[in-house]
Amino acid sequence: MPKTNRAQPGRLSSRFWRLLGASTEKNRSRSLTLVTDSSEYDDEAAGLTDEQLRKAAGLLNLEDLAESEDIPQFLAIAREAAERATGLRPFDVQLLGALRMLAGDVIEMATGEGKTLAGAIAAAGYALAGRHVHVVTINDYLARRDAEWMGPLIEAMGLTVGWITAESSSEERRAAYGCDVTYASVNEIGFDVLRDQLVTDVADLVSPNPDVALIDEADSVLVDEALVPLVLAGTTHRETPRLEIIKLVGELEAGTDYDTDADSRNVHLTDVGARKVEKALGGIDLYSEEHVGTTLTEVNVALHAHVLLQRDVHYIVRDDAVHLINASRGRIAQLQRWPDGLQAAVEAKEGIETTETGEVLDTITVQALINRYATVCGMTGTALAAGEQLRQFYKLGVSPIPPNKPNIREDEADRVYITAAAKNDAIVEHIIEVHETGQPVLVGTRDVAESEELHERLLRRGVPAVVLNAKNDAEEAQVIAEAGKFGVVTVSTQMAGRGTDIRLGGSDEADHDRVAELGGLHVVGTGRHHTERLDNQLRGRAGRQGDPGSSVFFSSWEDDVVAANLDRNKLPMETDPETGDGRIVSPKAAGLLDHAQRVAEGRMLDVHANTWRYNQLIAQQRAIIVDRRNTLLRTATAREELAELAPKRYRELAEEIPEERLETICRHIMLYHLDRGWADHLAYLADIRESIHLRALGRQNPLDEFHRLAVDAFASLAADAIEAAQQTFETANVLEDEPGLDLSKLARPTSTWTYMVNDNPLSDDTLSTLSLPGVFR
């Protein structure tokens, strides 16, 4: 059984760091020196009273964090404050991590090394320098937990701290954002930014100007969810996709009426299927100019929902509703939905009443949201593997932080099998073998269906396993906390951002030594993910803080990452005839898996870059609208412009309406038409994005065409909004019972709501190519 100890980030060469977007050895060495120097002030800090410690923190000169001579004193004060407030005395490596975040890096710290404490110290450092800090988490639970946990430390240094969740009121949000340090999920920060684009009075604004974003699970937020659009919608009447098409597609036969590609990421009608659909819809021509951008798109979207999106893999059904599963986190993607047609098609497929999304009033991607901040830094257990994306899209460096104690986890080379069935049998036998020793086992699966199937098999074999997936994620913290207990077998979907350490011997570590003697936590992966980062997040659950641990991944030539990225005809098929278990004996197997994973990562980077090019223009246009809106909201520009455009009408109204009231009326009119124009523009962009890839048929570059159409449409937006505002100003009736104008026709949505759009449900660029395959007949 060959075992390999994976290289730790701290041992990588400087050249390798730079290739991965890591910060230079020189910068890291300076930070190490500052940490060492801070120990000279430890005794002095320990001798201060709580009040003196608070005052000492306030006297620090940290305005220029890169050059401040007070950094060692700050670290000593932070170490002492942490111990008093939380009972945790930071290790040198945690102070090093905090310093690298204060330098604007994303740090890589292994699971269990204390990222949360390092992040709180960095947040305090920025706040003491006069900055406003948003600690960005991946969910509400972690935002509240970390704020309550680390709040006493931040307050011990004379600073204020607040937190925001989905339940927070506008007043609570405003108060939390007013604190020096604010903990909130990326969703809630984004939704507040969007909702602020509807206010017509400065006093109603909630979200402040962005300053510092310190991001927990930075690779998950900045890479995995970078292109997820956050959406603000309002009530309106919109037609849902035709149910007759959804029903018709459900009756088509695989292999005859439609085909899928090798990795089941694209589906298209065959000639036979196209003719069947055309006949059922009254003899239309799907590929005519009349139907190619409408009916054909509806058919392809319905086909996508029926064939490619699988229940308990891509979504679950709970309480008569479809809930998307976040593949990178293994849990329900709260508030997420697919684009309108696809969401309705999946709901119809499951026999659920289709939900209304309303009209999109504003939208922003997570990437655009984060890029608003003047300073971005963060922390995660797997930053180096995301270094290229962090550098390319955010200009961020990565600092690997060595563990406090050497990592002694043993990682076995992959066990590779010819078929998935042989692999699954081997996984069950392996878990039973390890379980019989009492060593705790954590099994990481790739989706809900796989986790439940494996769980059932283990129960049938007498193994009392517990399962954690999107269906029971409310039990998450308790299940994970006990996963290191003697004899426990835990089957879980993706481990990213679980937020709870697995301690040997259970949450109270009562059996720590007994479990350690058995080898610590044993991690089993049921297959490679499409990115090494997710594999490493699972591996990293074992061997925390110098504890023993081990890991092994089981793979097969039928796994998705292999089928999509390697030529099956070139794969070694030699097995051991004596065992007859279907396990590949070729030493090349593990290397081929690595290659398949690198190809998959390259494809995902291409998708990210391509989608970013589309979103970048929208983000630029949105920034222009936001700037114009802020000007109208905060100044007298609306009144001045309407007075210039309609001087006669303005003079007439000025004689009847007080100046302050007239200014408010002008502002409401201008803001309404600007918001109306932006919403219409977003709807137009969504429409052209749906069919833009058809431009390739005319040998046009889809991206260039999208940019041309979007720029042309945007060019007239501001002028049209001003013209519409002028018309309203000149024609609105004067109210009889009070000074003012009748603006009842400028009705805003009676209700609004927010959600996220999963634009790439298969982690591929499938949606943008839905209309292409069936076009070539």
Curated annotation (Swiss-Prot):
Gene that this sequence comes from: secA
GO BP field: intracellular protein transmembrane transport; protein import; protein targeting; protein transport by the Sec complex
Note: This Mycobacterium is unusual in only having an intact secA2 gene. The secA1 gene, which is essential in MYCS2, is annotated as a pseudogene in this organism (MAV_4203).
Localization in the cell: Cell membrane; Cytoplasm
Family: Belongs to the SecA family.
Chain's role: Part of the Sec protein translocase complex. Interacts with the SecYEG preprotein conducting channel. Has a central role in coupling the hydrolysis of ATP to the transfer of proteins into and across the cell membrane, serving as an ATP-driven molecular motor driving the stepwise translocation of polypeptide chains across the membrane.
Descriptive protein name: Protein translocase subunit SecA
Membrane topology: Peripheral membrane protein
Catalytic activity of the protein: ATP + H2O + cellular proteinSide 1 = ADP + phosphate + cellular proteinSide 2
Keyword ATP-binding annotated: yes
An MF annotation (GO) of this entry: ATP binding
Organism of provenance: Mycobacterium avium (strain 104)
Summary of subunit composition and partner proteins: Monomer and homodimer. Part of the essential Sec protein translocation apparatus which comprises SecA, SecYEG and auxiliary proteins SecDF. Other proteins may also be involved.
This protein's UniProt keywords: ATP-binding, Cell membrane, Cytoplasm, Membrane, Nucleotide-binding, Protein transport, Translocase, Translocation, Transport
GO cellular component: cell envelope Sec protein transport complex; cytosol; plasma membrane
Binding site for ATP: 94, 112-116, 501
HAMAP family, sorted: SecA
Major subcellular site: membrane
Top-rank lineage group of the source organism: Bacteria
PANTHER family: CHLOROPLAST PROTEIN-TRANSPORTING ATPASE, SECA INNER MEMBRANE COMPONENT OF SEC PROTEIN SECRETION SYSTEM
